C-alpha cells in the first residue's frame, strides 16, 4: 500500500481548490419585454434576443378554439 512521502501544506490544498468556487448565474434583460432571464435561454414569454421564437400553450389554445 502506498504511503505519501510528506503531507501537503494548507497552501497547496488551497491552490488545488482555487477553481472550485461557485459563481452567480449571469442574467440578462430582454430587449422587447424587459424580462430577466438566463443568458442564452428564452424568456417565459417565448422571446429570445427581442424576437418571438416560441408560442405559449395559451396562444396555441386560442388559435385552435
UniProtKB/Swiss-Prot annotation:
Superkingdom of this protein's organism: Bacteria
NCBIfam families, per database record: rpmF_bact (TIGR01031)
Record lineage: Bacteria, Pseudomonadati, Pseudomonadota, Gammaproteobacteria, Candidatus Pseudothioglobaceae
GO molecular function, one term: structural constituent of ribosome
A biological process term (GO) from this entry: translation
Biased composition annotated in UniProt, kind: Basic residues: 1-19
GO cellular component, one term: large ribosomal subunit
Pfam family, any one: Ribosomal_L32p
Identification of the protein by name: Large ribosomal subunit protein bL32
Spans annotated as Disordered: 1-32
Mitochondrion as UniProt keyword: no
SS bonds (residue pairs): none
SUPFAM superfamilies in the cross-refs: Zn-binding ribosomal proteins
InterPro entries: Ribosomal_bL32, Ribosomal_bL32_bact, Ribosomal_zn-bd
Family per record: Belongs to the bacterial ribosomal protein bL32 family.
Keywords recorded for this protein, A-Z: Ribonucleoprotein, Ribosomal protein
Amino acid at each position: 500500500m502506498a504511503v505519501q512521502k510528506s503531507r501537503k501544506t494548507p497552501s497547496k490544498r488551497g491552490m488545488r481548490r482555487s477553481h472550485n468556487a461557485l459563481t452567480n448565474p449571469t442574467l440578462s434583460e430582454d430587449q422587447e419585454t424587459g424580462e430577466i432571464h438566463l443568458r442564452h435561454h428564452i424568456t417565459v414569454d417565448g422571446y429570445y434576443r427581442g424576437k418571438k421564437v416560441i408560442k405559449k400553450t395559451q396562444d396555441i389554445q386560442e388559435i385552435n378554439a
